[in-house]
């Protein structure tokens, strides 16, 4: 039972990060009908910027509490990451809105490689240690352990997702986003600035990815210029699992995928008689993707996004 609780906690932590990144995928798809496969590398940029801010704080303002340093790293990473994503939309995607679907897809792959190359040039090829700023004393829950960093990650993820729901449901910008997602042409005729809405969508997705990136580094204590590839692909699987285009689906899909992956890692050895180890846990996300696309393409939430191509 303790193993189950431990893996469940691990899954919630992992799933929270997947959910934050999946929201970026699903929001962009909702308003543009486009999959931004470079989004995982936006997470990487957020983590790198966060680490740079922590290094500057250590050099020029030593002695700050760990929570304060993490908060400043996240607050500093968000605007820079938002700017990067806005530039991606403005330079790369805006001209391709009416292009065949293959063009934005190839462009996204090119942007991903470009971001990784820039990160490698600035921060180097080698993995970078991410400082552990919070106490290593674990918190015990039902015989299972969770670190203070992981508790903070869960709290921040909940706050970020709750804030997004309030923005989408209760603000003028949120109503504009829903209108553009429903029918961009009609939204434009109603006086909604669709370009502004699309830019805001990319910015919000980047902010969520920045939070996930900094907390990913804090949780795993190491980051590298290729770190965004696998989490980005898994977050895409989570978005598809939940129902891409649906923000609630992205949240649920991220959490479900994280739990499936963690439970799979914990029990795969027993299930296969020791033939497979926990290092095969990455296969679960893609098995889930194949099953969802085969059995329920609309995802858990079951909302079919209109094909506007």
Segments (PLM) and residue ranges:
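Transmembrane alpha-helical segments in multi-pass inner-membrane proteins
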Residues: 18, 70-78, 202-203, 209, ...
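Membrane-interfacial amphipathic/re-entrant helices at transmembrane-helix boundaries
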Residues: 1-22, 49, 60-73, 99-103, ...
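Single transmembrane alpha-helix segments in multi-pass membrane proteins
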Residues: 4-54, 87, 91-103, 239-247
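Helix-loop-helix "hairpin" substructures at the membrane interface of multi-pass membrane proteins
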Residues: 14, 145-224, 247-253
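Hydrophobic core segments of alpha-helical transmembrane domains in multi-pass membrane transport
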Residues: 47-53, 77-84, 111-119, 156-165, ...
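Membrane-embedded helix boundary and interhelical linker motif in transport proteins
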Residues: 31-87, 267-275
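Transmembrane helix-bundle core of multi-pass membrane transporters
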Residues: 95-96, 101-170, 197, 263-282, ...
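Alpha-helical transmembrane segments within multi-pass membrane transporters and channels
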Residues: 61-111, 118, 252-257, 261, ...
């Amino acid at each position: 039972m303790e193993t189950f609780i431990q893996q469940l906690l691990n899954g919630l932590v992992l799933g929270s990060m997947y959910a934050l990144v999946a929201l970026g995928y699903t929001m962009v798809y909702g308003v543009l009908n486009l999959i931004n496969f470079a989004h995982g590398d936006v997470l990487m940029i957020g983590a790198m910027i966060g680490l740079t801010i922590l290094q500057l704080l250590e050099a020029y303002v030593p002695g700050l509490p760990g929570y304060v340093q993490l908060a400043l790293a996240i607050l500093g990473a968000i605007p820079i990451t938002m700017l990067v994503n806005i530039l991606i939309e403005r330079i790369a995607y805006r001209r391709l809105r009416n292009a065949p679907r293959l063009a934005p897809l190839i462009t996204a792959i090119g942007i991903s490689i470009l971001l990784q190359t820039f990160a490698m040039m600035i921060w180097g090829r080698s993995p970078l240690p991410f400082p552990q700023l919070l106490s290593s004393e674990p918190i015990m829950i039902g015989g299972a352990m969770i670190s203070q960093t992981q508790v903070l990650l869960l709290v921040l993820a909940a706050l970020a997702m709750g804030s997004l729901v309030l923005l989408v449901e209760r603000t003028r910008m949120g109503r504009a986003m829903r209108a553009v997602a429903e029918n961009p042409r009609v939204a434009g005729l109603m006086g909604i600035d669709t370009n502004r809405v699309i830019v805001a969508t990319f910015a919000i997705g980047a902010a969520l990815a920045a939070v996930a990136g900094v907390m990913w580094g804090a949780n795993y204590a190491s980051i590298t210029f290729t770190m965004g590839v696998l989490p980005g692909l898994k977050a895409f699987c989570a978005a598809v699992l939940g129902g891409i285009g649906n923000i609630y689906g992205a949240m649920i899909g991220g959490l479900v995928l994280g739990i499936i992956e963690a439970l799979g890692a914990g029990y795969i050895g027993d299930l296969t008689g020791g033939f497979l180890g926990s290092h095969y846990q990455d296969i679960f996300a893609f098995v889930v993707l194949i099953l969802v696309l085969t059995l329920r393409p609309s995802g858990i939430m079951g909302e079919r996004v209109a094909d506007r191509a």
